[in-house]
Curated annotation (Swiss-Prot):
This is U1 small nuclear ribonucleoprotein C. A zinc finger (Matrin-type) spans 4-36. One of its GO terms (cellular component) is U1 snRNP. The keyword RNA-binding applies. Residues 68-216 are annotated as: Disordered. It comes from Aspergillus fumigatus (strain ATCC MYA-4609 / CBS 101355 / FGSC A1100 / Af293) (Neosartorya fumigata). InterPro entries: Matrin/U1-C_Znf_C2H2, Matrin/U1-like-C_Znf_C2H2, U1-CZ_Znf_C2H2, U1_snRNP-C, Znf_C2H2_sf. It is found in: Nucleus. GO terms for biological process: mRNA 5'-splice site recognition; spliceosomal snRNP assembly. U1 snRNP is composed of the 7 core Sm proteins B/B', D1, D2, D3, E, F and G that assemble in a heptameric protein ring on the Sm site of the small nuclear RNA to form the core snRNP, and at least 3 U1 snRNP-specific proteins U1-70K, U1-A and U1-C. U1-C interacts with U1 snRNA and the 5' splice-site region of the pre-mRNA. Belongs to the U1 small nuclear ribonucleoprotein C family.
Length: 216
């Protein structure tokens, strides 16, 4: 039956079983011999021994993946969240990421807005009477309609682009002065129509025929 040799204690164990090896490694003499062995050798040699032991364990098993490290080709975190360790934070909203479509090549800094390669965002369409990219100016008291706000629509029955001509213009009859034929005075208070003809009372019923109202 094969035996296990301990390099630290320089002895052979009785059996090469896991239970016997664990019992020997937990012993007081074995632990003291391990400490003395690493104290005798130099620091550089001790580090090389530790690296060799670590590499042997890594060769036998697979490395545990780190959840913080994203695999190649993964999407970056959304805007507003910090980047993963070893990864640049996401660019601000409206700027393409490096290496993407219409973006800067990897390793190049992001140009500022308006610089070479990244134009300013398009301005808002200019308002009537306002500057390009700005808000419409407020109307003033002596400013005619249409400077900053749409004009007042014409009265009903006229086309949208119709302009009312001044009095006495060609093609339109002149307005008669008050008291002339064709001029209808404005109705008095409480009347919604033209004045009643003479001979009628205030009532809406017609008066008696002539001759009936005379005394006999």
């Amino acid at each position: 039956m094969p035996k296990f040799f301990c390099d630290y204690c320089d002895v052979y164990l009785t059996h090469d079983s896991m239970s016997v090896r664990k019992a020997h490694n937990a012993g007081r003499n074995h632990l003291r011999n391990v400490v003395e062995y690493y104290q005798q050798i130099g620091q550089e040699k001790a580090q090389s021994v530790i690296d060799s032991i670590t590499s042997s364990y890594a060769a036998e098993g697979q490395a545990v993946p780190n959840p913080a490290m994203a695999p190649p080709g993964a999407f970056p975190p959304p805007f507003g969240f910090p980047g993963r360790p070893g990864q640049l934070p996401p660019p601000p909203f409206g700027i393409p990421p490096p290496g993407g479509p219409n973006g800067a090549p990897p390793g190049m800094p992001i140009p500022p807005p308006g610089g070479r390669g990244l134009p300013f965002p398009p301005p808002f369409p200019p308002a009537p009477g306002g500057a390009p990219g700005g808000l419409p100016p407020p109307p003033l008291g002596n400013m005619p309609p249409g400077q900053g706000f749409p004009p007042v629509p014409p009265p009903g029955g006229f086309p949208p682009n119709f302009q009312i001509p001044p009095p006495g213009a060609g093609g339109f009859p002149p307005v008669p002065p008050p008291g002339q034929p064709g001029f209808s005075p404005s109705p008095g208070p409480g009347m919604s129509g033209p004045p009643a003809p003479p001979g009628t009372g205030s009532s809406s019923l017609p008066g008696p025929p002539p001759g009936l109202s005379e005394k006999r």
